Curated annotation (Swiss-Prot):
It comes from Xenopus tropicalis. Its main location: Golgi. This is EARP-interacting protein homolog. It is found in: Golgi apparatus, trans-Golgi network. GO terms for cellular component: Golgi apparatus.
Length: 387
């Protein structure tokens, strides 16, 4: 069973920001943000034509500065937020803003005329998330199942919830909490849980992971020394409400049950350098992607701690006698966790991996040299999960 070859797209600038266009569930579309100190930065809107295995792109100018993170609105496919650096009074500030893709490019079907981006249009600014009193922005993330009017941002040691008003042209700080403790505490990443009516978020600072209830803005759990070194990224299992994945500079990926935080449920040690990104598949949570500065992307099958530890079970009424026997064998014991594939198309640090929001079997990875690689889950595993 021949697997499709990876599709590679090169940007002319260095890049570390990648997001799937969350609200787009028909077209396979990714957003990539560049990091250039000398030139105008860009967001490349990447459309992947699955049938012909080709990439179409649109380039949008992001005049505000080099892009450190992109987060796509869950409700409006044409709205996104970025964290970016700007120079002010010879100091570097990391800021955040909400943008709209210009109307002419909203369908995603008008390819940019050339690679020079000389005719590229600029993103339309909707509003800034004003962090002048709170320090440098570390990340911005949208309320997962919301109407695209609520955002979480982390800046230094502040956790802030924002409401967007007046067609998203105005941001209002609705609540905030300060991380307090010894030394200079600083958030590095955060994730909004899709469970519990979206009332919980998880944050990372140094080697610790903390859970917060955003109704009371109080800490609800803290995993001290979750990793031996800095925690880089977090992701919630979309189908198991208490399960959380983390990765860090200790080269490890850990899986946690937030009801019992004394030790991880599972630990992966497949990477040989810092792990920057971890992502659960939105539909099949046993599939977990990780990207690392060892320049590799690893796809793991974490079936034993997934929502279907015994595989895909079928109702008894739908089975013949022969199938019944097979099904009995299948249900006797949980399936084994394993590394499915290691992807080595990158030659530089892989800072981001993302699953497509339109096709659960397809994902993208981005390395610092501006190389975007689109890959698929191996067919054999896909059919094994489905059948």
């Amino acid at each position: 069973m021949e697997d499709d070859a990876p599709v590679i797209y090169g940007l002319e600038f260095q890049a570390r920001a990648l997001a799937a266009q969350t609200a787009e569930t028909d077209a396979i579309r990714f957003l990539v943000g560049t990091q250039s100190l000398r030139y105008d930065n860009q967001i490349h809107v990447i459309d992947f034509d699955d049938e012909n295995n080709i990439i179409n792109k649109n380039i949008l100018l992001h005049h505000a500065g080099e892009i450190w993170q992109i987060s796509a609105s869950p409700a409006d496919r044409n709205v996104l937020a970025t964290c970016y650096n700007k120079i002010s009074d010879s100091k570097v500030l990391t800021c955040a803003a909400v943008w709209r893709i210009p109307k002419e490019l909203q369908g995603g079907n008008h390819e940019s005329p050339d690679d020079t981006s000389s005719n590229a249009q600029a993103l339309e600014l909707l509003c800034h998330l004003d962090n002048t009193a709170h320090g440098n922005m570390a990340c911005v993330t949208w309320e997962p199942l919301g109407d695209g009017k609520k955002l979480l941002s982390l800046a230094d040691n502040y956790l802030m919830i924002w409401d967007l008003q007046e067609s998203s042209t105005k941001s209002v700080l609705s609540s905030s909490v300060t991380l307090e403790g010894k030394g200079q505490l600083r958030f590095t990443s955060g994730k909004w849980s899709p469970h519990h009516n979206c009332t919980q978020v998880a944050t990372a600072n140094d080697t610790a992971i903390r859970g917060w209830d955003i109704r009371s803005m109080r800490q609800i759990y803290c995993i001290e020394n979750a990793h031996g070194q800095l925690v880089r990224d977090l992701d919630f299992n979309p189908n198991k409400q208490y399960y959380l994945a983390s990765c860090g500079d200790d080269c490890k990926v850990k899986f946690w049950d937030t009801r019992n935080i004394h030790e991880p449920v599972k630990t992966l040690e497949e990477h040989s350098h810092w792990v920057w990104s971890v992502r659960y598949n939105h539909s099949h949570d046993q599939l977990v992607l990780t990207g690392s500065s060892d320049s590799r992307v690893i796809l793991s099958n974490m079936v034993s701690i997934s929502s279907e530890p015994f595989g895909h079970l079928v109702d008894d009424e739908d089975l013949s006698d022969q199938e019944d026997n097979l099904q009995e064998e299948k249900t006797k014991e949980p399936l084994q966790d394993s590394v499915i594939a290691t992807y080595e198309e990158h030659e530089d640090s892989v800072y981001a991996v993302e699953w497509s929001s339109a096709d659960p079997w397809l994902f993208a990875s981005l390395s610092y040299d501006g190389r975007l690689v689109i890959n698929r889950v191996p067919r054999a595993l896909k059919y094994n999960i489905l059948l």
